[in-house]
Amino acid sequence: MATYKVTLIDAEGTTTTIDCPDDTYILDAAEEAGLDLPYSCRAGACSTCAGKLVTGTIDQSDQSFLDDDQVEAGYVLTCVAYPTSDVTIETHKEEDLY
C-alpha cells in the first residue's frame, strides 16, 4: 500500500497537505485529518464534494455523476477518489460545474 501527499486548496485559498493511503477516499482522509469539506451522498452520485485536480492523478472509477467532459477538465468527486500519485486539488468547486 502506498501513501500519497494530498494538498487541498479551499475556497479561501488556504492550503492543507494530508497523507492519504491509496486505498482511502480523499474525502475520508481529509475528515480523519480534521478538515471540514463539503459532501452529501458519499457515493459519487452528486456534485457536493466536487473539486478540481491541479496536479497529479486519481482513480475515481466509482463515480457516476460527472460526464466525460467534466472528468477531462479535471473535476473530481473527493468522496470516491483515490490518489494514484501526490495530488493537488482545489475544493469547493460544485458551483463551477454548472
Swiss-Prot record:
Binds 1 [2Fe-2S] cluster. It holds the Pfam family Fer2. The keyword Iron applies. Residues 4-95 form the 2Fe-2S ferredoxin-type domain. One of its GO terms (biological process) is electron transport chain. This is Ferredoxin-1. Its cofactor is [2Fe-2S] cluster. Belongs to the 2Fe2S plant-type ferredoxin family. One of its GO terms (molecular function) is metal ion binding. It comes from Aphanizomenon flos-aquae. The lineage of its organism: Bacteria, Bacillati, Cyanobacteriota, Cyanophyceae, Nostocales. Ferredoxins are iron-sulfur proteins that transfer electrons in a wide variety of metabolic reactions. Signal peptide: none annotated. [2Fe-2S] cluster binds at residues 41, 46, 49, 79. The keyword Phosphoprotein does not apply. InterPro entries: 2Fe-2S_ferredoxin-like_sf, 2Fe-2S_ferredoxin-type, 2Fe2S_fd_BS, Beta-grasp_dom_sf, Fd_pln. Keywords: 2Fe-2S, Electron transport, Iron, Iron-sulfur, Metal-binding, Transport.
